[in-house]
Amino acid sequence: MQSYQQPLRVGVGGPVGSGKTALLEALCKAMRDHYQIAVVTNDIYTKEDQRILTEAGALEPERIVGVETGGCPHTAIREDASMNLAAVEALARKFGNLEVIFVESGGDNLSATFSPELADLTIYVIDVAEGEKIPRKGGPGITKSDFLVINKTDLAPYVGASLEVMERDTQRMRPQRPWTFSNLKKGEGLQAVIDFIVERGMLGVRG
């Protein structure tokens, strides 16, 4: 039987449209020359996020697997993660030397969490366009994720959101837990996410 190493599994969750797929694309492009990476995406009825990442050239197509969850996307990453676990294992066996597998959840709500059997680290993405109140609404995505990304800071003036208020509320809701503002269109905040993954995932700095 061919042996393979167990990769670091990083769960990426967040509401629809918050920027999960954009974050994954940016992470893959920034890290692929230094680490062996693969991705599992989740969509309810399609494999749209897999297609987006493939067409963007985030990774080689065979390193990106789409899972059609059906029903509630929360269930597929928490209560019954069997489809995702199977996809992760299949990728790990196929490549043998994978160091990181990103698992992107389908669009979900603030209560969504990853099963510890599926994700070693969790990143949760929200966006400023949802309003400055989002951090203080709490929920496990806000309070319990290992790293929080508040994306689309460039939209703050257009939606009447105060980044100062969001910063204050975030620090109050998740004291001692890391987070960052980001504008992924310009790459802002990306390095903070990479540094977190490398440090907490004990990957070793390369490049």
UniProtKB/Swiss-Prot annotation:
Subcellular location: Cytoplasm
Molecular function as annotated in GO: GTP binding; GTPase activity; nickel cation binding
Protein name per its UniProtKB record: Urease accessory protein UreG
Subunit structure: Homodimer. UreD, UreF and UreG form a complex that acts as a GTP-hydrolysis-dependent molecular chaperone, activating the urease apoprotein by helping to assemble the nickel containing metallocenter of UreC. The UreE protein probably delivers the nickel.
SUPFAM superfamilies: P-loop containing nucleoside triphosphate hydrolases
Gene that encodes the chain: ureG
One cellular component term from this protein's GO annotations in UniProt: cytoplasm
Family affiliation: Belongs to the SIMIBI class G3E GTPase family. UreG subfamily.
Keywords, comma-separated and alphabetical: Chaperone, Cytoplasm, GTP-binding, Nickel insertion, Nucleotide-binding
GO BP, one annotated term: urea catabolic process
Gene3D superfamilies: P-loop containing nucleotide triphosphate hydrolases
Functional summary from the UniProt entry: Facilitates the functional incorporation of the urease nickel metallocenter. This process requires GTP hydrolysis, probably effectuated by UreG.
The keyword 4Fe-4S is assigned to this record: no
HAMAP family: UreG
Amino acids binding GTP: 14-21
Listed CDD domains: UreG (cd05540)
